[in-house]
Amino acid sequence: MRLLAFFFLTAAVACGQSLAGEIRLEVKDATGAGIEATGSIEGLATGVHRDYRTDARGTRTFTGLPFGTYRLQIGRDGFAAQSVRVDVRSEAPIQQTVTLAVAVIATTVEVSDSVTLVNPQATSAAQYIRPEELRDRESGAPGRSFIDLVNQQPGWLLEANGVLHPRGSEYQVQYVVDGIPLYDNRSPAFSQSLGVDEFDSMNVRTAGFPAEFGRSLGGVVELNTNHDAVPGLHGQMSYQAGSFDQQSGFASLQYSRGRNAVSLSGEGFSTDRYLDAPVEQNYTNHASGGALSARFDRTWSAADSTHGYMSSRHTGFLVPDEQLQQAAGQRQDRTAGETLGQVSHTHLFNARVLMQVRGMVRDTSALLWSNSLSIPILPTQDRGFREGYLGGSVSVTHGSHELKAGADSLFDSIHENFGYLITAYKIGTVRIFDRDVPQSFQFSGQRDGRQQSAFVQDQWHKGPLTLSAGLRFDHYGVVADETAWSPRLGAAYSIPKAGLVLRASYDRIFQSPAMENLLLVSADLSAQLGGGAFLPLRPSRGDYFEAGFAKSILGKLRLDGSWYRRQVDHFADDDLLLNTGVSFPIAFSHAEIRGFEAKLELPHWGPVSGFMSYSNLLGRGRLPVAGGLLLGDDAQSLVAGAGTFPITQDQRNSFRGRVRVQAHRRMWLALESDYNSGLPVDLNVADMAFLRQQYGAAILSKVNFERGRVRPSASFDASAGVSLYQVDRKSVRLQADVFNLFDRLNVIDFTGVLSGTALQAGRNFAVRLNASF
């Protein structure tokens, strides 16, 4: 009882979100003296592989290790090598001492790779992006590298402009950077994207969420900037160039001495294809941007450490024109910026109790400007928000229990200014706006909001059985005042002789509405917009169910399979203002989504590695619609409507695959492919002659108007990399990528004239040079 009382009282004053632990290695000889050693740490199930060298005292700390099983290899000339198994199950550091014996009298101890291939305690599937995949990733378009990596995972798909959709969800993607959550849309069209070069590890999950995760639970992407501190000065640089006049660069420096480590990084880019163009000509699609960031780590003692991170990012880009807009001379400029600072402190009370406290402040902004030749609408926007975050958690290891409790608060100050001027109600014979829509409109709003949460969770291990349970409380107080209790349950059963883990999970979810244009869509402006109908936006509530398995095959491959079902009230989606890229959150009264996912992964088998993944999804939404910028007659039909329909992310079949071959110790080759069966089409213009004039016969041939879907798309990419120089930590690598190898015309979305139609880029290439020391 005293332990539980301490647990909850400390949590009340101390919720960082991180499912990662730490191993503190100490290597000794037979006399007990510390000795310098080298080796590697590997976890095939968690995608971790790091080579290391201890210091002269034989110590080395490995941070940011996702929960799972690891193999530590330790060696030194004149001593027998050893490999040991270490299970990381909590955030509390694990002290691992290894004694090396003289080679002539020692017996080598080995732990096979297959031990780490399947995580026997995982109650849900989580996809871990290996360091090799981060390093040798395709040279994606600016702002899309980490988005493309997530899109390779089962259950995820991309709509126009790099917007990620996990298991049919719109918006509800949570990004956790060093344990601090970011809930707003991070796609290029919405905000400044995160650069992948500054991150050391990445993992993705779509179910089995511990109670510490909340507010946005379509899917969670965890990004970690932790690097194991290596004494001295180190750095890396990269330069990328390719089609569409693309150029980008990244550089970072890290210096570590004693208990301190500091790093600085910067990046910049310029391209003539930033967003997904609506027509093949790729009109007005230029963008440029940059970012600066800094990190500071201080280890005060074996029990205390502090981490700080700051970044500033800014992007300016043009909105791609369609044919008639280009002919009219339209130009629309958008900018997105973010400045962020965060700090965290970890205190280890003893080997079983760990406390973490985190804080963050950030300021984001988004602007839209249109020239006088914009058609059929001239929109303007100036929005942003300032956000403060404060949270803490306490983790306790007690026998077979891994307990954790915590609380956090978000403090938001939101401002929005939006306006439009209609410059054409009709284009030719095609009506774009109803006559009762006012020609001009202006909105200005400001509001402070608060969100609070608290949680408690436990994971219990007994032999082959793992059980997890948690309870979360949320209060939302921005545009509504609602509370929710959300239980979470999970179970896993391991059958080691069969290399099989069976698992199941249940998540009750409570999700906040998206931040973009939130004040506008929450105000009843129907009388000013010619609609006469309005429903207020509310948080989403729902239930997620999943059952699945993980199977080791021949000790080399891992097969993951998951069946899932989601039932959500007030299902979040978005309402795009024609093709401006300005989006307004909406919610359908209810949605049900079910599907199956599978992934076959080969971490490495000799020179070969790779994966194949398949996703099947069926999603139906139900009217009416709340929120949004609903103009004219659309408001009545959507707000007062009834019936069901395919959700906008209802893509039945998706396939992803990649194979990589280490053809030579200095050269590798890779092929990557993807297939998408096609998204639903919401056609707002039935005049086929007009559509043909705007898009051409080639694009229209990619749309099945009878079925109301985009026709299937497929793409093949090829990559090659060569190590030009490699000595210890110094390396120079060159990589070349060719995308859409067969130059296939792929339509991502087709929603009619001026309403967000998007095309995948044709055949293009990129070359990237990397250097590190």
Predicted regions and their residues:
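Periplasm-facing N-terminal accessory domains of Gram-negative outer-membrane beta-barrel systems
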Residues: 14-127, 140, 181-183
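Periplasmic N-terminal accessory/gating domains of Gram-negative outer-membrane beta-barrel systems
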Residues: 78-80, 84-97, 105-211, 215-227, ...
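Transmembrane beta-barrel wall of Gram-negative outer-membrane proteins
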Residues: 241-270, 280-316, 333-355, 487
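Surface-exposed extracellular loop regions of Gram-negative outer-membrane beta-barrel proteins
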Residues: 314-316, 322-323, 365-367, 415-420, ...
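Membrane-embedded beta-barrel scaffold of Gram-negative outer-membrane proteins
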Residues: 356-360, 366, 494, 536-594, ...
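Gram-negative outer-membrane beta-barrel transporters
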Residues: 461-466, 563-567, 586-685
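C-terminal beta-signal and adjacent terminal beta-strands/loops
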Residues: 666, 674-696, 711-715, 722-773
